[in-house]
Amino acid sequence: MAKWNPQKRVLNHEHTRFWRFELRDVDEPNLQKEVFPYDEVSRIDFDHRIIPIQPAEEIFITDTTFRDGQQARPPYTTQQIVDLYQMMSRLGGYNGIIRQTEFFLYSNRDKEAVRMCQDLGLQYPEITGWIRAAREDIPLVKEAGLKETGILTSVSDYHIFLKLNMTRSQALEEYLGIVKAILDAGIVPRCHFEDITRADIYGFCIPFAIELMKLREESGVDIKIRLCDTMGYGVTYPGASLPRGVDKLVRAFIDDADVPGRLLEWHGHNDFHKALINATTAWLYGCSAANSTLLGLGERTGNPPIEGLIIEYIGLMGKTNGIDTTVITDIANYFKNEIEYKIPSNYPFVGADFNVTRAGVHADGLIKSEEIYNIFNTTKILKRPIVPMITDKSGKAGIAYWINSHFGLSGDSTVDKRHPGISKINKWIADEYELGRVTTISTEELEAKVRKYMPELFMSDLERIKFKAAEAAIAVLRKIIDDPAMKTMQPELQEPVMQRFIEEYPSIQFAYVVDMNGKKTTRNITNIVDRAKYENYGVGTDQSDREWFIKPLQTGKLHVTDFYISKMTGALCFTVSEPITDDNDDMVGIFGVDIRVEDLVKEPEYIAEATQIALKAEYDAKYKSDHWL
């Protein structure tokens, strides 16, 4: 019988048994070659049915940075995941506009990242899982203590027939079985309708969704459905037909499968430059959740960018609802500085040049009023003031301002216009225009000149590698230092701790402890292959003249040496050392480790550069010694 629609306040027609959406179990896959000819660009066809917008009652954002986002790049470290998760929470705000995020659950690193994010106790985004449609994966979700997980339920015949080697009925039976098993485990299932924009919508997807809604009614659990535009085929044109029309896809699930819009989620890809507009269109036609990643990073061409959805959300709603847009810039800076990801300079909202204009007529407009050529108050909304264009009229003050703005220098780090490097850059610019130049100086040109004339502002690639290696060593070193056994200064207790350290981190060539007089107190803790090389370097060896001993003794702080060539192994190394303190915080000794550069740096040019530095330092030291300097 007809059902009451509380939103539209009328009775919805219910089809008789002669006109119901039931599974069409075909013998051959329907690959819809008339729309998706593999040797040609796919077609965009129209049925000329225009659907009015019917926005979801509530719209929000979900995230897949730590799942889909990691399929496009080297995996994030555990700490990077924790840091990004915290920033994501700040960005989405107290109302949870960024409502959920999903994690892989397979590796120890994945599990550790989930645990560390859970320990933060943040309400949003809620942490959910992602598993295959396999019963053996369900315990992973339970072990992680998660309330919800996504499951891969591919819906196109490309996947069902060609990838899974199943029929539609077999796939449906398999999917419903895993959903029931997840429900039995007390977990909320989120079915990922993979490759939906190439699927038979009324021959498989809607019948599948109807069965899921039956399970929802029986179990009382809100089973969710993610509409996955896996290949980015979705289009937003009025009158575009299924399966590519985003509006018709969303309404089919709501109107014909009786799926509440709050349980629908759009997951898109950017293969045809439509990831963002497809996601926001799904919002406008009743889908509550739009799935995304930070900076749009995802498999192949990526996903809708969170920062883009954030700005679009505010534009559609007319208010922020607790969103902190300035965090967008914090996230971008983290990607650039910590993850060392190069963001394209013209990337919206976060690229180096997104609010920079170079055309002379535009520059004139900006001088008269910032609003003429700036999209909004980028200083207030994104902490990104307009960066001035540099010409021969900028002068030293303008160049200094550009450098400080572009590189985010503040306080004591700022560059003054009297810096000698500024004068050299200013002269180069003047010479350019003297020779007939009429365009503004590009960001790339200025960066190159700043690197040339003000190198102290930059770490070299080699220094950055050393810094990262030392940073990793320091984190482990401090764990060792804090071990109660180390504080005792009793070698028989310290040595087992140090040996475990060496075995866990093979780049550590040698670990040792010296007392306050610089005398070595521990036996040779090294890899077995190097043990014989340290035969004459036993307990009692005097190290009091070594930099790694003197500096921590003087400052009470951790110290990292320059590169050197080990006299024991001939390997290129650097040393990290730190004071050992007792329970009264009194210094009782120094703990040091020698780290092999070759194990950390694979690029031969960097090893060669570091070797030259080490050899020069060795020569200089010998020269001073020979000349009593």
UniProtKB/Swiss-Prot annotation:
Identify the InterPro entries for this entry: Aldolase_TIM, PYR_CT, Sensor-like_sf
Instruction: Report the SUPFAM superfamilies cross-referenced here.
Output: Aldolase (SSF51569), Sensory domain-like (SSF103190)
Q: Tell me which cofactor or cofactors this protein depends on.
A: Co(2+); Mn(2+)
Keyword RNA-binding listed? The answer is no
Pfam family for this entry, one = HMGL-like
Molecular functions per Gene Ontology: citrate (Re)-synthase activity
Catalytic activity of the protein:
oxaloacetate + acetyl-CoA + H2O = citrate + CoA + H(+)
Give yes or no: UniProt keyword Transmembrane: no
Q: Which residues form the Cache domain?
A: 497-601
**Annotated Pyruvate carboxyltransferase domain residues:** 59-329
Activity modulation comment: Inhibited by p-hydroxymercuribenzoate and EDTA.
Task: Tell me, using the record's free text, what induces this protein.
Answer: Expressed under all growth conditions.
Name the EC number(s).
2.3.3.3
Per UniProt, the keywords (alphabetical) are: Cobalt, Manganese, Transferase
Disulfide pairs here are: none
Q: Which Gene3D superfamilies match?
A: Aldolase class I (3.20.20.70), PAS domain (3.30.450.20)
Family designation: Belongs to the alpha-IPM synthase/homocitrate synthase family.
Its biological purpose is as follows: Catalyzes the condensation of the acetyl group of acetyl-CoA with oxaloacetate to form citrate.
Q: Which PANTHER family match?
A: HOMOCITRATE SYNTHASE, ISOPROPYLMALATE_HOMOCITRATE_CITRAMALATE SYNTHASE FAMILY PROTEIN
- Subunit-level organization: Homotetramer.
Annotated protein name in UniProt: Citrate (Re)-synthase
Taxonomic source organism? Syntrophus aciditrophicus (strain SB)
Its lineage opens with: Bacteria, Pseudomonadati, Thermodesulfobacteriota, Syntrophia, Syntrophales
